[in-house]
Amino acid sequence: MNLSHDTVTQEYIEIIADLENENKVARVKDIAERRGVTRSSVSIALSQLAKKDLIAHEAYGHIVLTAEGRRLAHHLTLRHQAVKDLLMDILGLDEAIAEQDACKFEHLISAETYSALMRFLYLVRQCPKKHGQFIREVRECARAYSDGTPCVECMLK
């Protein structure tokens, strides 16, 4: 999936997909509320999304993702979940922080980084022998380091 779309485009697609899932329809008013922008700003953005064939929208009508828009939304959801899983399951961050940071990070990583992240998560989850031990050790080291303990001291224990 080509993620060459800018961050703002990606964020609009995610909001529209969320609104479609929640309300079955996406409206300019609802998008403006979620983005914290004016309706006219949303209208300008929607015309750009329509030019990219990511949405179908008629003036004063509902906004609908096209097949390409749905593919992009699905891919963004997968990226978001992968980053959130890393932050929560591996690094042990609180869900609220992981959610907030995943929203930012998902737009910045390259396809190569995403692939490497997916391979890493798969490996960590599939290793029946080391999975729990690895995660415990990572979290233990993270806690020790946050207290100012150098890694060398942690490793010698």
Model-found features: residue ranges?
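C-terminal regulatory/oligomerization modules of transcriptional regulators
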Residues: K104-K157
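N-terminal helix-turn-helix DNA-binding core of bacterial DNA-binding proteins
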Residues: L3-V37
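Basic, amphipathic "hinge/linker" alpha-helix immediately C-terminal to the N-terminal HTH DNA-binding motif
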Residues: G61-H80
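Glycine-centered, phosphate/nucleic-acid-interacting loop/turn motifs that mediate DNA/RNA or nucleotide
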Residues: D53
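Key DNA-contact positions within bacterial/archaeal DNA-binding proteins
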Residues: S40, A96
